[in-house]
Amino acid sequence: MINKNCKIQKFKYPFPYIKIQDFLDKDFYKNLEISFPKISDFKTSDRSVSRMNYDTTYGDNLYKKLLANNESYRKLHEYIYSSTFIKYFLELFKNNIQDEYNNNFLTEDVLNYQINNQPFEVGHIIGKKEFTNKLEKFLYPRMDLGSGIKGYGKNNGGGGIHIDNPQRLISMLFYIGGYEKIIGGDHRIWKKSNNNNFLDIHETIKPEKNCLIASLQNNLAFHDVNPIEYIEGSRNAFYLAISSSVPVWKKVKRSKFSIKYNKNRVRNSLFQKIKNILN
């Protein structure tokens, strides 16, 4: 399944991320690509995620049908929801994770967490308001399949520059074709400007087939989707993640900058804290 000759590039700045070209074996990848759900399949199925224009995840009827009828997708599902998948990427980011913990940016020693390889974050995406201190601490995987069409990236795909939710340890994007021609749709890596008040583009990554992008979602992991201006077909992708059952990143102080670019992790205002207690 995993191509032993894949090309792995590691980067530390502006935050740890990895690009893996030819990630899957050629024949296995091809089977996934030709069997990827059509837009019409997404339209006629229920959905519980709104990450892309059209998507599906564990528990949805389309996802169940895909696993029941397609051996390649069944094998992919079994791999993603396994300790093998989680350990593979923990090893790739091991030194980065240790550095984040040693510098108190990671509040939990996640490398010593237990692994729950069963679907945990089923359907909707868990946000910062939904966590409690009573949860057992463990790492778990997630996989969503989705398609982006013209306009994707304006109001979805994270809704502009952002960092993922506070439970996300490693986020991944795997491109699986779907289009003949595309303008936009790139994954953009952002960095803080010299005065730390603005963000500048650090790298723009094209949505190339069989390419996987993985990033450690620390508090500098600013990224977004360059909105699709024109496309013949659809930008098909898997969103993959390794997350914690509890928030693991240092809380971010409230400021105009963090409210705008790190809304998923910024500390709640006094009003919001009172509202949460009352609810």
Model-derived features: positions:
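Fe(II)/2-oxoglutarate oxygenase catalytic core
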Residues: 1-279
